[in-house]
Amino acid sequence: MSVVGIDLGFLNCYIAVARSGGIETIANEYSDRCTPACISLGSRTRAIGNAAKSQIVTNVRNTIHGFKKLHGRSFDDPIVQTERIRLPYELQKMPNGSTGVKVRYLEEERPFAIEQVTGMLLAKLKETSENALKKPVADCVISIPSFFTDAERRSVMAAAQVAGLNCLRLMNETTAVALAYGIYKQDLPSLDEKPRNVVFIDMGHSAYQVSVCAFNKGKLKVLATTFDPYLGGRNFDEALVDYFCDEFKTKYKINVKENSRALLRLYQECEKLKKLMSANASDLPLNIECFMNDLDVSSKMNRAQFEQLCASLLARVEPPLKSVMDQANLQREDINSIEIVGGATRIPAVKEQVTRFFLKDISTTLNADEAVARGCALQCAILSPAFKVREFSITDLVPYSVTLRWKTSFEEGTGECEVFSKNHPAPFSKVITFHKKEPFELEAFYTNLHEVPYPDPRIGNFTIQNVFPQSDGDSSKVKVKVRINIHGIFSVASASVIEKQNLEGDHNDAAMETEAPKSEGKEDVDKMQVDQEEGGHQKCHAEHTPEEEIDHTGAKAKAPPSDKQDRINQTIKKGKIKSIDLPIQSSLYRQLTQDLLNSYIENEGKMIMQDKLEKERNDAKNAVEEYVYDFRDKLGTVYEKFITPEDMNKLSAMLEDTENWLYEEGEDQPKQVYVDRLQELKKYGQPIQMKYVEHEERPKALNDLGKKIQLVLKVIEAHRNKDERYDHLDPAEMERVEKYISDSMNWLNSKMNAQNKLSLTQDPVVKVSEIVTKSKELDNFCNPIVYKPKPKVEAPEDKAKTGSEHNGPMDGQSGSETSPDPPKGSSQHTDSGEMEVD
């Protein structure tokens, strides 16, 4: 079973795997542990990762990058429209209203949904993992920003399915970093001690996230998390780009922003300059050759200028830090350490802002690039039954409060209940009880839209079906289980109706007692029900019910029973209670239909097959080209002696014609055409190659056979001379060996004489394979006879027995060590020196 963690970044991706007792970040086919989040589509194939990044400038309109923020959003979303201005490729509205990318692929304009684009990238990462692990990969854990909403999370899950991956968990990036930090710590406080509080700061290319986590031995709890989804390394790049665009407009009279290719080149150079300024405070040059209109441009920048330029961005670093401390109810002195990850945290001014706020040094013990992927791989290992991992519990949180809304029966009023508050532990389940006589609908939405970086608060609608009144006409008691699952996604997990069946003989008593709660008010029966008597818009607060569950431990929190609950329990005992599961119809916001998802999966399979066929075609073409260059080079050197001048001229012309064909009409041919062309060349080239190989290897093969013949001849000569080493060999068998060796020598001499009479351009009389076969036959025939071991000479048994009889003690010697046991009944000395007498 594979254990893979994937850091699905905005700019780059990392893959970590669990193997050899640890976590290892793996490299791709370019020996690079970092795979760019880029997909370039061409007329015949796709390039993904490093190959696609090299085409960002050359294939501007069809190279997709920077698409992570488009997940789960409609085309009309303000964020999508903002990103649209930044992106050099075209965005398109899909039939379901979501955002798609319009590119040219296989010589036609085609739209791709964001789930398909991310699916392509994940499929590439899957392939890289399989190449490293040498086995299929299916299960994985994928990282996402902690601020992703339900729609965005479901979109990433769909992309994983498109790639053929089974995502065991969508893990918040800061939580993954916390796991990578905490699981190896041996000095964490025990469970009964005060936890160690650590702040994790992650500023990547597009977003800034902060979380506070409490650590005990074998336990991690996320206390609070804050973020700025619109602050990252690319904002600092944009500040530099805007500065140089203005400068070049004044200095060179060119408008860079009108030329997308030039703008991309400037972005690349500004990113390099930003990284150089992080390590160097002096003036640094910016030089770009043939930038626009054949102009070479140049400028310079230093760190002080850069920090002044980005002052407004640096001012946004502190507010999330203050917010996370307020939410966690912690002071600066409560923080044990501050860990930073993400590429943008390498900017000295960002580090300075963090240090100034916490008044303590920051720690850089974690790998800023790979910590998220390593944390995901650890989580995958914890979830996998194939790996034994140190026990470590992880409690994440809900970043936004979630509220349920439903219609009441009184004048079409509505009821509301906040089921999960902000920073509520997750994964978590709650059971809510409703009193209803008919099917009803629950609407889930984010309570405070101003806290959510998403324009629509809706999560989804859930219809509880098959709800009917009780047999006595009363409302049915419907228990609804709501859940924030391991992926951080809200759902209505199940619903059931409690059906009361009165026992015979107790009908009147039961009826009276079931009415008692009604007179006391239905709120007393259940903490989360709607007061039907008050119409209009009302709110109630969700309280912990006895059914409330914490998923990661499986324990249930039991509430102490009240007096009223005791009376209800007595009523239940007098009646038969039956729980019936109810069907739930879910309508989730921005959820892909199963048919659409299946079509995406099918299309991805077709594109993978197209890539495979194109690779095979290119490999066949490259094989022809390689053969032409290699053979032509050897034809003028090592093969020259093995071909006649006429044949050489003919073959040289054929090679030259093939080379010209490759760059003309043979530029774009089916795979089989290249295979046939290579076979045609080999038909003429292989005989020459064979003569050369035979000529090179024949002397060694002949020498080996000659040595073996000489060794056997020496044994035959020694046997004739009555050498005692071979006097055990059978004379008849030795005669057979002598005859075999004589025949072998005659065969060898005749073949060598015949070969010496031939020129190098002629086919050999004897092949190396025949000589090797002859050598093996000689070994098989002669060796069992001439190397038969001498029989061992055994000493006579009588002498051995005689010797053993005289090895005992002589008269007068002590024979205590070998004396036999005394007979029963006779007296003997004991260890204590006493004598036993009968």
Swiss-Prot record:
<keyword id="KW-0597">Phosphoprotein</keyword>
<dbReference type="GO" id="GO:0006986">
    <property type="term" value="P:response to unfolded protein"/>
</dbReference>
<dbReference type="InterPro" id="IPR018181">
    <property type="entry name" value="Heat_shock_70_CS"/>
</dbReference>
<keyword id="KW-0539">Nucleus</keyword>
<dbReference type="GO" id="GO:0006457">
    <property type="term" value="P:protein folding"/>
</dbReference>
<keyword id="KW-0067">ATP-binding</keyword>
<dbReference type="GO" id="GO:0005829">
    <property type="term" value="C:cytosol"/>
</dbReference>
<feature type="modified residue" description="Phosphoserine">
    <location>
        <position position="74"/>
    </location>
</feature>
<dbReference type="InterPro" id="IPR029047">
    <property type="entry name" value="HSP70_peptide-bd_sf"/>
</dbReference>
<dbReference type="Pfam" id="PF00012">
    <property type="entry name" value="HSP70"/>
</dbReference>
<keyword id="KW-0547">Nucleotide-binding</keyword>
<feature type="compositionally biased region" description="Polar residues">
    <location>
        <begin position="813"/>
        <end position="830"/>
    </location>
</feature>
<keyword id="KW-0346">Stress response</keyword>
<dbReference type="GO" id="GO:0140662">
    <property type="term" value="F:ATP-dependent protein folding chaperone"/>
</dbReference>
<comment type="similarity">
    <text>Belongs to the heat shock protein 70 family.</text>
</comment>
<dbReference type="GO" id="GO:0005634">
    <property type="term" value="C:nucleus"/>
</dbReference>
<feature type="modified residue" description="Phosphothreonine">
    <location>
        <position position="545"/>
    </location>
</feature>
<keyword id="KW-0143">Chaperone</keyword>
<feature type="compositionally biased region" description="Basic and acidic residues">
    <location>
        <begin position="791"/>
        <end position="804"/>
    </location>
</feature>
<dbReference type="InterPro" id="IPR013126">
    <property type="entry name" value="Hsp_70_fam"/>
</dbReference>
<dbReference type="GO" id="GO:0005524">
    <property type="term" value="F:ATP binding"/>
</dbReference>
<feature type="modified residue" description="Phosphoserine">
    <location>
        <position position="579"/>
    </location>
</feature>
<feature type="compositionally biased region" description="Basic and acidic residues">
    <location>
        <begin position="506"/>
        <end position="554"/>
    </location>
</feature>
<dbReference type="InterPro" id="IPR029048">
    <property type="entry name" value="HSP70_C_sf"/>
</dbReference>
<feature type="region of interest" description="Disordered">
    <location>
        <begin position="784"/>
        <end position="838"/>
    </location>
</feature>
<dbReference type="InterPro" id="IPR042708">
    <property type="entry name" value="HSPA4L_NBD"/>
</dbReference>
<comment type="subunit">
    <text>Homodimer.</text>
</comment>
<dbReference type="InterPro" id="IPR043129">
    <property type="entry name" value="ATPase_NBD"/>
</dbReference>
<comment type="function">
    <text>Possesses chaperone activity in vitro where it inhibits aggregation of citrate synthase.</text>
</comment>
<feature type="modified residue" description="Phosphothreonine">
    <location>
        <position position="761"/>
    </location>
</feature>
<keyword id="KW-0963">Cytoplasm</keyword>
<dbReference type="GO" id="GO:0005737">
    <property type="term" value="C:cytoplasm"/>
</dbReference>
<protein>
    <recommendedName>
        <fullName>Heat shock 70 kDa protein 4L</fullName>
    </recommendedName>
</protein>
<feature type="region of interest" description="Disordered">
    <location>
        <begin position="506"/>
        <end position="566"/>
    </location>
</feature>
